Amino acid sequence: MAPAPSFRGHQWTYNPVRGSCLLLLLLMSNLLLCQGKSCPSCGPDVFVSLRKSFTDRFMNAASLSHDFYNLSTIMFNEFDEKYAQGKLYYINVTKSCHTNSFHAPEERDIVQQTNIEDLSKWTLVLLYSWNNPLHHLVTELQHMKELSNAFLSSATRFENMSEKLQAFIERQFSKIIVPVLNTMIQARSSWTGLPSLMSSDEDRRHSEFYNLFYCLRRDSRKVDMYIKILTCRTHKTC
């Protein structure tokens, strides 16, 4: 089996022809489902209507990713205000993110040059990487009685948003799932903060919560940017 491709930001170049072909193939795959069947929707305007449905799905995903990032920012700011004032949790927090080893691009000019396949791969890499820590984050927050029900509800909603975004990318780009998993295995990235999150030492526990909320906000911003650029590509507006 060939090794999984390497996705370093400085090596990426966006090929508009390849990107357009990928979108066309995705649309044509839906058309092929109608062959040999009685299909009322397979009239002369089927391509236009399929493309509209395709782009509408991306618009919905872009709206969801926007809310995804905004909610992560709200949660970080609220936790920071309530628990981190006068603390030194922010020191070295950028080095604590478990997704650092992926080197997922965050500069917009680099992301804009990235092809559709790699953008979708990076989106899934980040979302998959948060499944375990996000589950434990939501679970452990339930034990913090001083947090408002609204905050706990936001954390649960955020986890649901992540699942919906994953499902969307998986449906649109199913062939990238194995390469994504290979990339994650090769990066040897894993979250090791569970002992701190469950510690009886309140300061240690709060420090880990702070790290998670900080890194979650950073990575959700990347996911939002990737999906918005994928969306503008489908609309041919960028």
UniProtKB/Swiss-Prot annotation:
UniProt GO cellular component terms: extracellular space
Organism: Bos taurus (Bovine)
Name of encoding gene: PRP1
Keywords linked to the UniProt accession: Disulfide bond, Glycoprotein, Hormone, Secreted, Signal
Family of the protein in this entry: Belongs to the somatotropin/prolactin family.
Domain of life: Eukaryota
SS bonds (residue pairs): C97-C215, C232-C238
Chain positions carrying an annotated carbohydrate: N70, N92
UniProt keyword Protease present: no
GO biological process: cell surface receptor signaling pathway; female pregnancy; mammary gland development; positive regulation of biosynthetic process; positive regulation of lactation; positive regulation of receptor signaling pathway via JAK-STAT; response to nutrient levels
Location(s), subcellular: Secreted
Molecular function in Gene Ontology: hormone activity; prolactin receptor binding
Signal sequence bounds: 1-36
Descriptive protein name: Placental prolactin-related protein 1
The protein's role, per its UniProt record: Placental prolactin-related proteins may play a specific role during gestation.
InterPro entries, per the entry: 4_helix_cytokine-like_core (IPR009079), Somatotropin/Prolactin (IPR001400), Somatotropin_CS (IPR018116)
UniProt PTM: N-Glycosylated; the glycans terminate in either N-acetyl-galactosamine (GalNAc) or N-acetyllactosamine. Terminal GalNAc on Asn-linked glycans is greatly reduced prior to parturition while lactosamine-type N-glycans remain unaltered.
